Regions:
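Hydrophobic alpha-helical transmembrane segments
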Residues: 1-15, 87, 149-156, 249-266
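Hydrophobic, lipid-facing residues on alpha-helical transmembrane segments of integral membrane proteins
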Residues: 11, 15, 19, 78-89, ...
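Membrane-proximal soluble regions of multi-pass membrane proteins
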Residues: 20-75
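C-terminal ends of transmembrane helices
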Residues: 21-27, 62-70, 123-135, 177-188, ...
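Long, charge-rich boundary regions
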Residues: 61, 66-143, 147
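Transmembrane alpha-helix boundary signature
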Residues: 90-105, 155-164, 258-262
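Functional transmembrane core segments of multi-pass inner-membrane proteins
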Residues: 107-108, 113-221, 263-266
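Interfacial loop-to-transmembrane junctions
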Residues: 193-194, 228-252
Length: 266
């Protein structure tokens, strides 16, 4: 039963991942996410339903458009598989792990699972938009803040309303202070305004500790990823989007934050 639930979660997640690909591609361009139907960006070929099956269609089409044979970006199946894996991980970590007897519904853990899925979904979309466009959309940041506050009003959210509000303030003010000092000292932005809003959104879901976790883990991951580029191009400056790293840091804290807190305070 557990394997079946995880498999269903993966399939459902990959379907949402296909939708996320539409959001990632169209929203920064100001295009409608409803119309027109998905088309090949090279030749305009209208993608048929059987050519739009998450992950599998990419494999069957061998990564090429069926009409013009131009390559389809590997990013599409990556987003679909990543989202499927994330959905399955959330279902296991926040529900199955606490409720191995799946015949009994636990409302508290269902709410936590839904919150984790929605939170991560926002981060996935924002991360890939940031990678492509070096921007983080206000609609997701502000919408995420509202969503985090709404979950905190329930007795089953990750944090209570007080912690959520403190997380928003802390996630917005501390990074802004870092941004301001860096701008004054280096005469350049070390942190984007979109990153600050993203951290406020992270704080709405997970409070102050999740903001700190996102900043710490995000900085470490970002540094490790950036080192090869820095070593190869010592005299050149590159802008590396920080949103994906903050998102990874927040996800790590969401899954392992309680363990880390116990280690730190015992």
């Amino acid at each position: 039963m557990t394997i079946l639930v995880l498999l269903i979660s993966f399939v459902l997640g990959s379907i949402f991942g296909s939708l996320f690909n539409v959001l990632i591609y169209r929203l920064p361009r100001g295009e409608s996410v409803v119309y027109p139907n998905s088309r090949c960006p090279h030749c305009g070929h209208r993608i048929k339903p059987y050519e739009n099956i998450p992950i599998l269609s990419y494999i069957f089409l061998k990564g090429k458009c069926s009409a013009c044979k131009n390559k389809i970006s590997i990013r599409y199946p990556i987003v679909e598989a990543l989202t499927g894996f994330y959905f399955s991980l959330c279902v296991y970590a926040f529900y199955i792990k606490n409720n191995p007897d799946l015949s009994i519904l636990n409302i508290k853990d269902i709410v936590k699972t839904i919150e984790a899925i929605l939170f991560g979904s926002i981060l996935i979309v924002q991360s890939f938009i940031d990678l492509d466009w070096f921007i983080l959309l206000d609609s997701f940041n502000y919408g995420g803040i509202l969503l985090g506050l709404l979950f905190s009003l329930t007795p089953y959210g990750f944090v209570d309303i007080k912690s959520s509000i403190l997380g928003i303030l802390f996630g917005g003010l501390l990074p802004f202070l870092i941004y301001y000092i860096y701008l004054k000292v280096r005469k350049m932005e070390g942190l984007g305004i979109g990153d600050i809003k993203l951290l406020a959104m992270i704080g709405a879901f997970g409070g102050v500790y999740m903001v700190l976790g996102a900043m710490f883990f995000g900085s470490v991951i970002g540094l490790l990823v950036s080192i090869p580029t820095i070593l190869k191009n010592k005299n050149m400056q590159y802008y590396i989007p920080f949103g994906p790293f903050l998102s990874m840091g927040a996800i790590l804290w969401m899954f392992f934050g309680k363990v880390i807190e116990r280690v730190l305070w015992t």
